[in-house]
Amino acid sequence: MNLLCGNIKTLYFKYLSAAFGSALISSIYGIVDMAMVGQYQGPDGTAALAVVAPVWNVIYSLGLLMGIGGSVIFSTKRGSGMSGDGENDQYFTAAVIGSVILAALAWIGLILFERPLLMFFGADETLLALAQRYMIPVKVVFPLFLFNQMLAAFLRNDGAPALATLGVLSGGIFNVFGDWFFVFPCDMGVYGAGLATALGSTVSFLVMLTHFASRKNTLRLVKPKRLARKSRLTKRGYRRIIVVEF
């Protein structure tokens, strides 16, 4: 798929369907999470998930900050013919390094300050117990939620929008059926919903990683140069954070 010479209409609808599909399945499994927990735990269960919602906003926003910001500049450099000097790979590398740093900080922050954060987001003693139980499996794979956002953005700009959608779709489908299986047949309640979410994110991550074994892959990690200057990728990504948060 050639972004420079391909048919504009075909390219537009290919990328539109991929982006729409990803957003749709993300919305669906968020609703299913709420429905399953609500049926099992009652109103307190859905309220506990609402308390956790800001945590998702933060980690998704950080992933978009690196992914959207980095992938836009990556494509710009490649489209301008600068891919030969490896400048586009520099921005992919910078985005990966930035993602690792932000994921580590968010992970540590969540582990150390989980209780005060959830209380700040509105949990009382009853909701706090449920929210913390939901977060037990989620905390294990918490960085993957950031990496998935970053990888999906780069895959779409590396000519693999279908794989990015497949990654989100496969994780979402696993989450939907995992919610039912872990919550009801396994009688895990809100913990089961968290487990399904954690495993679904892992499935998405593994599916998107297959891109790096593909012949179509042009994403390369290189030795970073003038890394501080590459931080301008955050200027391209912060607008997306505003959309997600507000």
Spell out what each predicted region is:
Residues 1-19, 74-143, 185-246:
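Short alpha-helical transmembrane segments in multi-pass integral membrane proteins
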Residues 19-72, 138-145, 236-246:
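Transmembrane helix-bundle signature of multi-pass secondary active exporters and lipid flippases
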Residues 28-31, 40-43, 77, 157-158, ...:
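Helix-loop interface residues and adjacent transmembrane-helix termini in multi-pass membrane transporters
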Residues 58-61, 175-179, 205-209:
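Hydrophobic transmembrane alpha-helices of multi-pass small-molecule transporters
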Residues 99, 154-180, 191-198:
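Alpha-helical transmembrane segments of multi-pass membrane transporters/permeases
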